[in-house]
Amino acid sequence: MSLDLALDVQYATASDYLPSEEQFSLWVKTAIGNSMEQAELTIRIVDARESQMLNSTYRGKDKPTNVLSFPFEAPPEIELPLLGDLVICAAVVENEAREQDKILEAHWAHMVVHGCLHLLGYDHIEDEEAEEMESLETQLIESLGFTDPYKEQ
């Protein structure tokens, strides 16, 4: 079974390197895997100002962040393939990759996989949940040909 994906990528900022829609599509399909037959998802690439505003509004943290996940929650009687939205801050992803000595493309892939897992209901608030989510992220990222994102460089 292959995922029927309707992906809308919105580039709301410019940068030296932004992944292509094809890369985003591959990363989303890898993260979602066989958990859904159809999925609709928006990925919005933003600057630090927009990320900070959204992070402040929805999480109470007045600073930009790497990825925000906004799951779509339909009433139980309505079945829709709408998974939700990811908002990714290009500047934060670039800074983190540089500071953590990670390959920029690998860090982008990790942020997309991480965000998609949140949209699928995974979380990392409790230690046990965090271990499960990180283990799955590592498997998915390694399946894309990148190294373990949680391994110390």
UniProtKB/Swiss-Prot annotation:
Zn(2+) binds at residues 114, 118, 124. One of its GO terms (cellular component) is cytoplasm. It is found in: Cytoplasm. Its main location: cytoplasm. Keywords: Cytoplasm, Endonuclease, Hydrolase, Metal-binding, Nuclease, Ribosome biogenesis, rRNA processing, Zinc. Its EC number is 3.1.-.-. Its cofactor is Zn(2+). InterPro entries: MetalPrtase_cat_dom_sf_prd (IPR023091), YbeY (IPR002036), YbeY_CS (IPR020549). GO terms for biological process: rRNA processing. It comes from the Bacteria. GO terms for molecular function: metalloendopeptidase activity; RNA endonuclease activity; zinc ion binding. Binds 1 zinc ion. Pfam families: YbeY (PF02130). Single strand-specific metallo-endoribonuclease involved in late-stage 70S ribosome quality control and in maturation of the 3' terminus of the 16S rRNA. Belongs to the endoribonuclease YbeY family. HAMAP family: Endoribonucl_YbeY. This is Endoribonuclease YbeY. It comes from Shewanella sp. (strain MR-7). The gene is ybeY.
